[in-house]
UniProtKB/Swiss-Prot annotation:
Protein's name in the database: 5-methyltetrahydropteroyltriglutamate--homocysteine methyltransferase
Family matches, as Gene3D superfamilies: 3.20.20.210
Details of cofactor binding: Binds 1 zinc ion per subunit.
Pfam families: Meth_synt_1 (PF08267), Meth_synt_2 (PF01717)
Residues noted as binding Zn(2+) in the record, renumbered to the chain: 655, 657, 679, 740
Taxonomy of the source species: Bacteria, Pseudomonadati, Pseudomonadota, Gammaproteobacteria, Pseudomonadales
Organism: Pseudomonas syringae pv. tomato (strain ATCC BAA-871 / DC3000)
Cofactor(s) of this protein: Zn(2+)
Binding sites annotated in the UniProt record for L-methionine: 445-447, 498, 613
């Protein structure tokens, strides 16, 4: 019999119960007993809802108080020395150790006077919008079983009568995700010390009556060096003698050159992602022995659309012919990346809601597909397949999805639409003459502090308690304050502060046709931080101007230059749930045309500088380098399409906030923004090496202070950083600005830091 299973399930709860409990605990409003009770209730509810959906083998170990990689670090005893005082008397970690590692802690390792030990680094989980805590390894790293959570949860699930499959991050993926600290060394040197602890974990699980364990090894979808491939063989040969059956789970891409390795590992089963890489199925069917289990991920774990059951079933039937009862059905990856339950959405348009599926509904789709293999004539199977066909046809034919005007406009785009009228060298001369800015011009990235007054006004307006006129007055008051502060500080190019914006994507998405919004479509970003991405369901267009009135008002308050502030097409796309029926490239082009219209309206309103933020530009890179150039080509083209309609004298800025430029510097240059502002202060300007080596041709504003900290930098520090930048970039092409927007900071530290920043620029002009 084919079997239905999940690789993982969301942990936050349908009403974000985990987020609320965590934040209450951190504030001291909930004790640890209460927090643990919430976790236990969520786990029980999630196991039950999956079981009721028809999932036969339930994941255990997918629950985490903050992040699954952090939980695994505690399990293996990988706890940086600076957090040792947060452990118990026996030297073992506690829940507070876990939170200290995630959030930082005071008075660790002999620190006194409230000094905070910094948290572990947070970074993206492969190419998703989830973030994990990066393990820190030392050359003398020791591993020991130190955290009982997994075993306790297996007991919990067994007590409730569930058949479970514990989920572990595989040893090679775990080492790959970590960073070497202190002396440089090869992380693979740690493998032989790590494997005995995995063996101990497997022994404990076997003693609990577990039959199958899932090893998540998504690094098998990456470009792996040969020594890592060899290490895979060594690791799994070492673990093959444990009494448990092992399923190696790969996802987020195809196995490609790692297929031979994955197919011959001494394990009992292999999971592959057929959503991201459907083309790999024939090769896997050819290479994987039929006595092993093949788990096919046919339901998309990373998006919100209902599965095309007919299409998925065709692939499953092809595999079923060879693997028979050794075929398992699953999501493409953990459902962690999907919202929890569509049934909570009681205000969605019924037609649009019918096209969607969240984690609970995806679990049901997985079960139906498994049932279809085992009993194709069953009534529920026949009905589900018929309904799926109707829904897919409805969506494919809907006039709400397809807009002929948008499609015609896109078809009429020419190469000239992607080109500024003149080269940068000519444009910058005209712009400098028009703007008349001093050397080392000062500006900020866009947002100013979002105070409680701003948030309360926005909330009251959304709830209908504050009229549009009163809300507009409240936001204009905030804009006046932001402009006055900037003028008093002596900044050269001003911003309006973005008081009216709740989020840099959602604000624009709410004003574009082709987007829909949920009330409960939350997914975890990390810890207690959840995001509710907008959903692109149809062709995208801008019915009317989105920012012009606000920016025009701000410009009316000052004689200084006011920047228009927009979010770029790639970032809009990457931070939304996108369509599956058209390519990301097409969606980016549609967004680019909508933003182009806004840019031109701002120009017509007399705005001399327009900033188009592309914070997610690098995040869109595929996991395999061979696929990078195709992405970079269309991402650059989308930016150029939205930015290239303006006259030479209108200056286009872009902002990027990430820490690696070397491998994409040519593409960043190809965007042809007149000015790029970037995050560099934490790297002590080392990131500018990429711009120096490549001889980046346009203006640059390297961030001179870190906005993620409340610390106010001294003027001398910023002078030093700008001087360092000037050794790499000609001084006449340098701008002076913070690393990122100031939305999360308070006004006192913001003003203090900007006073020093302006002073630094003035000092350099002498």
């Amino acid at each position: 019999m084919a079997l239905a299973h999940n690789l993982g399930f969301p942990r936050i709860g349908a009403d974000r119960e985990l987020k609320k409990a965590l934040e209450a605990y951190w504030k001291g409003d909930l004790d640890q007993t209460g927090l643990r009770a919430v976790g236990q209730q969520l786990r029980a509810a999630h196991w039950q809802v999956q079981k009721e959906a028809g999932i036969e083998l339930l994941p255990v170990g997918d629950f985490a108080w903050y992040d699954q990689v952090l939980t695994h670090s505690l399990t293996l005893g990988v706890i940086p020395e600076r957090f040792s005082p947060a452990q118990d008397a026996a030297g073992l970690p506690t829940l507070d150790t876990l939170f200290a590692m995630a959030r930082g802690a005071s008075n660790c390792c002999g620190a006194s006077h409230g000094k905070t030990q910094h948290a572990q680094e947070l970074t993206k989980w492969f190419d998703t919008n989830y973030h994990y805590l990066v393990p820190e390894f030392t050359q003398d790293q020791r591993f020991q079983l130190s955290w009982e959570q997994l075993f306790e949860e297996v007991d919990e699930a067994h007590a409730l009568g569930h058949k479970v499959k514990p989920v572990l991050i595989g040893p090679l993926t775990y080492l790959w995700l970590g960073k070497a600290k202190g002396d440089s060394f090869d992380r693979l040197e740690l493998l032989d010390r790590l494997l005995p602890v995995y063996g101990e974990i497997l022994g404990r699980l076997a003693a609990q009556g577990v039959e199958w364990v899932q090893f998540d090894e998504p690094v098998l979808t990456l470009d792996l060096p040969q020594d890592w491939k060899t290490a895979f063989e060594r690791a799994y040969h070492s673990l093959q003698y444990s009494p448990l059956k092992k399923l190696v789970a790969t996802y987020f891409g195809g196995l490609e050159d790692n297929l031979g390795l994955a197919a011959t590992l001494p394990v009992d089963g292999l999971h592959i992602d057929l959503v991201r890489a459907p083309e790999q199925l024939p090769a896997v069917l050819d290479r994987l022995p039929s006595y092993k289990v093949l788990s096919l991920g046919v339901v998309n774990g990373r998006n919100v659309w209902r599965c095309d059951l007919d299409n998925a079933l065709a692939a499953l039937q092809q595999a079923h012919a060879r693997f028979g009862d050794n075929l398992w059905v699953a999501g493409s990856c953990s459902l962690l990346h999907s919202p929890v339950d569509l049934n909570r959405e009681d205000r969605l348009d019924p037609e649009l809601k019918g096209w969607l599926a969240f984690a609970v509904q995806k679990s049901r789709e997985i079960a139906i597909l498994s049932h279809a293999l085992n009993d194709p004539e069953a009534t529920e199977v026949v009905e589900a397949l018929a309904q799926s066909c109707e829904i897919q046809a409805s969506r494919a034919q809907s006039s709400r999805v397809h807009n002929p005007q948008v499609q015609a406009r896109l078809a009429s785009v020419t190469a000239a639409d992607h080109q500024r009228r003149s080269a940068f060298a000519e444009r910058i001369t005209v712009q400098r003459e028009r703007l008349k800015l001093p050397a080392f011009p000062t500006t900020t990235i866009g947002s100013f502090p979002q105070t409680s007054a701003i948030r309360l006004a926005r909330q009251a307006h959304k709830q209908g308690k504050l009229s549009l006129n009163d809300y507009t007055d409240a936001m204009r008051h905030e804009i006046r304050h932001a402009v006055q502060v900037q003028e008093n500080l002596g900044l050269d190019v001003l911003v309006h502060g973005e008081a009216e914006r709740n989020d840099m994507v959602e604000y624009f998405a709410e004003q574009l046709d082709g987007y829909l919004f949920t009330r409960f479509g939350w997914v975890q970003s990390y810890g207690s931080r959840c995001v509710k991405p907008a959903i692109i369901f149809g062709d995208l267009s801008r019915p009317q101007p989105m920012t012009v009135d606000w920016i025009r008002y701000a410009q009316s308050l000052t004689d200084k230059t006011m920047k228009g502030m927009l979010t770029g097409p790639v970032t809009m796309l990457m931070w939304s749930f996108s369509r599956e029926d058209v390519s990301r490239q097409v969606q980016a082009q549609q967004l680019a045309l909508a933003i182009r219209d806004e840019v031109l309206d701002l120009e017509r309103a007399g705005i001399k500088i327009v900033q188009i933020d592309e914070a997610a530009f690098r995040e869109g890179l595929p996991l395999r380098k061979a696929q990078w150039q195709q992405y970079l080509d269309w991402a650059v083209a989308a930016f150029r399409l939205c930015a290239s309609g303006v006259r030479d004298e209108t200056q286009i800025h872009t902002h990027m906030c990430y820490s690696e430029f070397n491998d994409v510097i040519k593409s960043i240059a190809a965007m042809d923004a007149d000015v790029i502002t970037i995050e560099t202060s934490r790297s002590d300007m080392e990131l500018l090496d990429a711009f120096e080596a490549f001889d980046y041709p346009n203006d640059i504003g390297p961030g001179v202070y870190d906005i993620h900290s409340p610390r106010v930098p001294e003027t001398a520090e910023m002078v030093s950083l700008i001087a360092k930048a000037a050794r790499r970039i000609p001084a006449e092409r340098l701008w002076v600005n913070p690393d990122c927007g100031l939305k999360t900071r308070g006004w006192p530290e913001t003003e203090a830091a900007l006073i020093n920043m302006v002073a630094a620029a003035r000092q350099l002009r002498l």
